[in-house]
Amino acid sequence: MTKYIFVTGGVVSSIGKGIVAASLGRLLKNRGLKVTIQKFDPYINIDPGTMSPYQHGEVYVTDDGVETDLDLGHYERFIDINLNKYSNVTTGKIYSEVLRKERKGEYLGATVQVIPHITDALKDKIKRAATTTDSDVVITEVGGTVGDIESLPFLEALRQMKADVGSDNVMYIHTTLLPYLKAAGEMKTKPTQHSVKELRGLGIQPNMLVIRTEEPAGQGIKNKLAQFCDVAPEAVIESLDVEHIYQVPLNMQAQGMDQIVCDHLKLNAPAADMTEWSAMVDKVLNLKKTTKIALVGKYVELHDAYLSVVEALKHSGLANDTAIDIDWVNANDLTAENVASRLADADGIIVPGGFGQRGTEGKIQAIRYARENDVPMLGVCLGMQLTCIEFARHVLHLDGANSAELDPETQYPIIDIMRDQIDIEDMGGTLRLGLYPCKLKPGSKAAAAYGNQEVVQRRHRHRYEFNTKFREQFEAEGFVFSGVSPDNRLMEVVELPDKKFFVAAQYHPEYHSRPNHAEELYSAFVTAAVENAK
């Protein structure tokens, strides 16, 4: 029988529910259990694909091509699993499915209501997360906070799950903030008490509290919360601020969190062996060397817009025994006049993905600087497209070369819309999304990075591609297309072989990076940056 764990939040949002859920997932996986995890987002968007990164951080893409919340990146990196379309559910997605069924007459004339139709659809997503992955445990995080009007159908579905599958197969974990009032010199439990009261009013009694706090709460505070919130004292778990998020699973294990969960759910599983994870964390905290990477982007004010890129760089730093110092460079501020001084200290330069005109000329200046000064450079998605445009302008001397996305009237559309995208009008969910194969050129830097594999599979998120009408001109000047689709139609990876490392990929390598296994192209880039720093 599959076990279901539901993680809710109270008092404030952005309290770290995703990290708590991911940490628990890692602990249970290391006990030998098969774990999957999903995020319920109460917003009305179908998915975050059309949302501004300033609103929601990065968009994370799954193997099966679903645009999802950035928390799924945490889940995959912590637990080292690949999630699917059932791992991110929004209000918009559920309501659109229910309304589509109503239009088809599938409800046989019934009045369509929140209960049972919306809640049944939500429960179906929870159960499908289990059946499609054959998991022992499903962890479901509910976004937002208890008391939000948008969350009510989600919480009702969670309440009903207990009756559907039995109390021994369901566990509710509530995460809250434990504020410290400096003037009073004490921690305040009242916000947590009220949050639990609100949750209980909706029919859910939490079995465990996870309290986010800057300082240790002490047993007295835990006993007080246990008494007022009707949970066992040992089931009040502290989520202390830490130097690195990968410390959280170890802190949770030290408090017996996973054992309490297993006892409640009657899971007979051996203790989690966290030796390898602990060694990884110890290494992260004791890196002696530092490598400076300039990240040239348009959303640099919000670091979460590049969360997977940052994590992939850190993983690659770990693989190369170096800490990564990220220099956040606003592409809007880069010009031909200041690019050299602004990037002079960079050991390597990364130009990540993005959409739209703003910042593209600054990114092109950064790419040109990297090429002309032989600074290791990695381009990703739009970064790959701009790498091609920079080469066209300054090596092939195709003045005005551009992307048809950025300049529909350009004489030299180096980047053009994909053929199967021409007649698509909707923006959301219509990009080339998900896992696709890439055939690597033997002897190339890309092939070397991937251990000379013939084909790799990586996740994509784009609508435009390199215009192959210009391929011969590029190749005549030493530009190498080192990764292509199996049918040779799409140019996936480009590079200049005479440089230390000047490689750009149309796909998003960062989605495949894990703390214990850095993504190979990122790792090769960081290796080159480390060498460049010497």
Swiss-Prot record:
Allosterically activated by GTP, when glutamine is the substrate; GTP has no effect on the reaction when ammonia is the substrate. The allosteric effector GTP functions by stabilizing the protein conformation that binds the tetrahedral intermediate(s) formed during glutamine hydrolysis. Inhibited by the product CTP, via allosteric rather than competitive inhibition. Mg(2+) binds at residues 71, 141. The active site is at 381 (nucleophile), 508, 510. ATP binds at residues 14-19, 71. Keywords: ATP-binding, Glutamine amidotransferase, Ligase, Magnesium, Metal-binding, Nucleotide-binding, Pyrimidine biosynthesis. UTP binds at residues 13, 188-193, 224. Pathway: Pyrimidine metabolism; CTP biosynthesis via de novo pathway; CTP from UDP: step 2/2. It catalyses: UTP + L-glutamine + ATP + H2O = CTP + L-glutamate + ADP + phosphate + 2 H(+); L-glutamine + H2O = L-glutamate + NH4(+); UTP + NH4(+) + ATP = CTP + ADP + phosphate + 2 H(+). Homotetramer. HAMAP family: PyrG (MF_01227). CTPSs have evolved a hybrid strategy for distinguishing between UTP and CTP. The overlapping regions of the product feedback inhibitory and substrate sites recognize a common feature in both compounds, the triphosphate moiety. To differentiate isosteric substrate and product pyrimidine rings, an additional pocket far from the expected kinase/ligase catalytic site, specifically recognizes the cytosine and ribose portions of the product inhibitor. Belongs to the CTP synthase family. This is CTP synthase. It comes from Streptococcus thermophilus (strain CNRZ 1066). The gene is pyrG.
